[in-house]
Amino acid sequence: MSAPLGPGLLGGVFDGLLRPLSEAGTWLAPATTGHTVPDHRWDFTPSVRAGADVDAGDELGVVTTDGPIPIPILVPADVAGGVDSIRGRGAYRADTVVATVSGTAVPLTQPWPVRRPRPSRDRIDDVEMLPTGQRVLDLLFPIARGGTAAVPGGFGTGKTMLLQQIAKWCEADVIVYIGCGERGNEMADVVQELQDLVDPRTGHRLAARTVVVANTSNMPLMARESSIYSGVTVAEYFRDLGYHVVVIADSTSRWAEALREFSSRLGELPAEEGYPADLASALAAFYERAGHVVTLGGRRGSVTIIGAVSPSGGDMTEPVTAHTLRFVRSAWSLDRELAYARHYPAVAWSGSFSTDAQAVGLRRARDGDPDWTRRRARVAAVLADADRLDALAELVGRRAMPDAERVVMLGGRLLREGVLQQSALSPSDGFCSTAKAAALADAALALLDRCRSLVEAGVDADTLEGVDFGPLIQAREQAGPDDAATVDRIRDAMLARLGELS
């Protein structure tokens, strides 16, 4: 199977075979797919003249669209030489040949086999953090551009909502959202919200930078099985154009179930829990297509892959989850108890990890945030100590605990409620910049340090627990998405109030 790569992908909704669904009357129904991409005419402007020498990946021209992202037309990966002919500026259909290079016709839309990774010149080792707009991820479990992450979690823990928030607000040029085997109403909500929301960086609708591959649970087996490959192939295409792309797959467990069903129909011998024996190889091949690269044309682009995993009954030892955790560099494990306590995002700070954190800390220090690593370590340590002391307090009672330990428990509550919790429905808190996240974390840690010094000076823990810390907890919604100054003012006011107790 090959995917048609060219203008018309951005803002579109497709099935797993990359057939457009956007203009169907009821696009989630397995009915007529509506008009196809080649029916539209695109404005093409040539960048080279006939007779010029070009290599694979070089730009032949540019297609301008109504959105914020221009689409360069590149020399195919296996073609190089002189430009025999090239069309002038004008509007052309997607299947129109706009140039001929060494006897090879180059149309606006070029096919590519979805199971074959697109080539690149080199991989970039330098780590650059991908801001997601979610504080718990950007503070504790960062993901690098070109990295991989898994989001394992049981039913009702908020996987889809977290992935939708990342799709809306992460700092990427293009988002490829793959809904594989999900409920139709969830896919409809994603498409509608992307149409309604505005990208604060470009001023265009978020849908203008998004490609949605919608495969609901009632769609054919082959569409579900191929949707993952189609989506990552589209992502590699935009990477080759020089863009930073994020692929969100929700969920890889449904894709693995399609593999299991297909393998069963072929009569193959099943492996653990009925999955095919090559499940691990298939997952590895998918996640290995992520990367931060130098393209054939010398541009820089990246594909970051974030995949949800839906283990049955929350069993993290089942094959899909176990194999996925072997191949990803970050895991954001969702905790059922946090979700039931209405703590969202329900990312468990004790069960998640990021192998990119150390390299991200070095890069953040070079970029002007030298305290990033120290801040992350302190937040993680306070949360771990607070969890341990909270469990002990349930046995002996809070008042039986020493004042110094009660202050640590207070600091853990400030971090949980004032920093890590985030409302996806709030206009000012749904997205959070790295500067505001750092200001909130620094404010909570500063208040904790002041409370510790007050306890050492003789102030009892009952007095400190009676202080109203509501302004800090409310600061995450009162301050704008990028308003760190308001958080700093609230911190200073709270520190002054605590100073009156000494």
Residue ranges and their predicted role:
Residues G16, V63-D66, D78, I86-R89:
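Residue-level recognition of beta-strand microenvironments
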Residues M1-E23, W27-P30:
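N-terminal accessory targeting/assembly segments
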Residues L139-L140, G146-F469:
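P-loop NTPase catalytic core
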Residues L5, L17, G25, D58, ...:
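Glycine-rich, histidine-containing beta strand-loop boundary motifs that form or position
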Residues A24-T65, I71-P76, Y92-G147, L162-Q165, ...:
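P-loop NTPase nucleotide-binding/switch module
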Residues V13, E59, V83-R87:
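Conserved hydrophobic positions within beta-strands
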Residues V455-S502:
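C-terminal amphipathic alpha-helical interaction region
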